[in-house]
Structures are given as structure tokens and as C-alpha cells.
Design a protein with these regions (language model features):
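Small-residue-rich anion-binding loops in enzyme active sites
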Residues: 1-13, 120-125
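Charged, low-complexity surface patches
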Residues: 4, 14, 58, 97
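N-terminal basic/disordered segments at the start of proteins
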Residues: 5-24, 103
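A short, structure-level motif marking secondary-structure boundaries and short turns
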Residues: 5-7, 50-51, 90
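Iron-sulfur cluster-binding cysteine motifs and their immediate structural context
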Residues: 10, 20-43, 51-54, 58, ...
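General structural feature for long, well-ordered alpha-helical segments within catalytic domains
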Residues: 14-17, 21, 30, 61, ...
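DHp/HisKA histidine-phosphotransfer helix
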Residues: 46
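Iron-sulfur-associated redox domains of electron-transfer enzymes in respiratory
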Residues: 70-252
Length: 252
């Protein structure tokens, strides 16, 4: 872990929460812990005789976490090339906010332009957001997509790149995640080349705020007395109220 990352991002509560630093860490010493707002460094020790000595896991490191962190970059505003409105048709057609994205991904997968997609899904039993790799049109259609709840989408990136050996991966996430991919593509570090060569498409959803999964328990279960198995989809109607913990969620 770079001292710069700790000083300029984590200590200032400026972490995007995308998880790319965790995925890219060559020593795999960064991890997420429950309730934390940023990754933490694993504490490792080595036993020498009867003495246990703490190890500096980041010594002689290429600092891939710094190379991939979007919060260490000042981003200039990008001029849009095209502004348009669209509706989903075909296998994806329900009018939900993420359906246009899923229709694009389904078309890309069916045409062979994409090998798979790294995206967020919602566990139907726990209502917890999870990052997953989807590889078929059927999986893309069935995946809920982002539900305004935070989870590090890049948790599933290594599975796509190194387990499935995908060469044409799409990543769907928040604008922060898209900025992380831009930072990744700008890097000249050869250790990041497998990611650069595998990510073909990056899609950022419109984002006016994303919320902790604990809000499900606080708002739906405790305040509204709605059991988790009654919820099919989550929609945020008044983002200000949601941010204050008084969210108006619809249980369908």
C-alpha cells in the first residue's frame, strides 16, 4: 500500500469504493472488511524462532494500487459526443432504468463482440449487492444490475481476466468505476497490461449517489416492516430522503 494512497485518499474519506486497487494488488494484501469505507492492508507476520515479526507487505512493490486509483487524478470534464434517449427492445423490455444497458450488453454478447460482463447484481435472498461475471445473454437479461446500493464492482474482475481468460470484457459500474478504468488504461506499467487488453467496453450509469447496503435493513426491514423476500426491485424516488436514511423505497 502506498503512503500516498493512505494519505491522499483513505485518510480523507475520498475512496471511490470501486475496488480496483484490491483487484490489481500484485501481493493480494488489500482487502475489504465489513463496515469499512475503504480497503485495508492485511497484517502479516513471520515466525523466526520464537519471535513473531511483522512484515511490511508493501516493500519493493510496484504500487499498482496507485496506478489504478481514480481519486489520485484530477479529471477534466469530457465533452459529450452524442446525447440521445433510448428504450430497450427485444429480450430486455420492461422499462426499468438499467434495461438499455442490458440490451446493449445482450447485443454485444450475442454478436460475439463481448465474452462476458463484470457487473453488479442483487442477491434475491439477502438483498445484498454482489459483483459477478455473466457470460451468456440469458444471464445478462436476468441480472438486476446496479440497484443504488454500493459494492466494489471490480471484486469480480480477476475472475473474468484470469479464471475465465476473457479477452473482450465489458464493465458496468458507477462513473467512479469508469474513471478507474480510464486511469488503468493510461498506465504504462506492464503488470496492468492483462487488464488493459481484456477490458473492451466500459459503461457508467447515471449516478446521483449510491448508498450502503445497510440501508436495506434500516429502511425496509426496521422502519417499513417489509421482509426481504417481498422485494423484487429497489427504486430510489427521493434521493435526499434516502441519503438521510428516510428513503422512499418501493417493494414490488
Amino acid at each position: 500500500m502506498s503512503k500516498r494512497l493512505e494519505a491522499e485518499v483513505w485518510s480523507l474519506d475520498n475512496c471511490a469504493g470501486c475496488g480496483l486497487c484490491v483487484a490489481a494488488c500484485s501481493k493480494q494484501v488489500l482487502e475489504w472488511e465489513p463496515g469499512t469505507l475503504h480497503p485495508v492492508l492485511q497484517k502479516r507476520t513471520k515466525l523466526l524462532g520464537l519471535s513473531r515479526t511483522p512484515l511490511d507487505s508493501c516493500s519493493f512493490c510496484t504500487q499498482l494500487c496507485v496506478e489504478s486509483c481514480p481519486r489520485l487524478e484530477r479529471w477534466a470534464e469530457m465533452e459529450p459526443r452524442l446525447v440521445t434517449a433510448a428504450r430497450a427492445r427485444g429480450p430486455v423490455f420492461s422499462g426499468a432504468p438499467n434495461d438499455v444497458i442490458r440490451a446493449i450488453l445482450a447485443a454485444g454478447r450475442s454478436s460475439g463482440l463481448l465474452d462476458g460482463v463484470v457487473m453488479l447484481d442483487l442477491d434475491p435472498w439477502t438483498l445484498q449487492p454482489v459483483a459477478r461475471v455473466v457470460t451468456t445473454v440469458e444471464q445478462i437479461v436476468e441480472t438486476m444490475g446496479p440497484q443504488y446500493l454500493w459494492a466494489p464492482v471490480f471484486d469480480a474482475l480477476n475472475e473474468a481476466v484470469f479464471t475465465h481468460h476473457m479477452q473482450n470484457v465489458a464493465v458496468v459500474g458507477t462513473p467512479c468505476a469508469a474513471q478507474a478504468i480510464r486511469k488503468l488504461r493510461q498506465s504504462t506499467n506492464p503488470r496492468l497490461r492483462p487488464y488493459q487488453e481484456s477490458i473492451r467496453l466500459s459503461i457508467a450509469i447515471f449516478c446521483t449517489g449510491i448508498y450502503k447496503p445497510e440501508m436495506i435493513e434500516e429502511v425496509l426491514v426496521k422502519r417499513m416492516n417489509v421482509s426481504r423476500d417481498q422485494v423484487k426491485r429497489i427504486k430510489a424516488h427521493d434521493l435526499l430522503e434516502v441519503a438521510e436514511g428516510l428513503g422512499n423505497f418501493l417493494a414490488g
